[in-house]
Amino acid sequence: MSQDKKNIKEGFCQIQKREDRKFLIGRTYKDFISYTDDHDNVSIVEMDTVYNGQSGPFMQTFKFLSYSFIFIIYHEEKSAKAMVESVDPLESILGKDLFLKEVKVIKTDRGSEFSDAEGLEKDNDGSMRTYVFYCDSMASCHKGSLENNHKEIRYICPKETNLKVLGFDSQKKANLIVSHINSRPKENLKGKSPLE
């Protein structure tokens, strides 16, 4: 028996759960379902990250479900602080009123980069700007619409390739990627593109 199998059999290899899960209280997928049941026509944005290596670069992806519109923010690091800081320019681009209308809910996964729920939910003056909910563990189907767009991103930036060697090195390149994706006609938009 190999040493690895022996260690597993003897219980040496244990998965360590993240200790602090307080950010999930009131923000689980079950809470998301309850919230959307109680609030008709709520605008939902799905959020995730796409990357090929732990050294980056990283793409923080946002999908506006009402419009099938995707937006990418370029990052050099994948930290909770970086993810929170990217919501500010999104709010700035849309303007406060439009942001409050179109980004009522952000649905994301439980990645450590999204663990600062309060930072994502509140703007710089501490007022609520959105509600964050987390998909169940290992349930990418809970944000399947965005995952489908990730397939389009992977067509441009295949897995296991160095993104910087491909030329993905700036927000300008991220904008070019989403320009291509948002220009494609979508069946759910009756043959129109998200930009139309």
Which residue stretches match the model-derived regions?
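Mobile genetic element proteins and their domesticated derivatives, centered on retroelements
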Residues: 48, 62, 68, 87, ...
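Active-site beta-loop-alpha junctions of metal-dependent nucleic acid enzymes
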Residues: 52-55, 72-97
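Short, surface-exposed connector motifs at secondary-structure boundaries
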Residues: 67-71, 97-104, 159-160
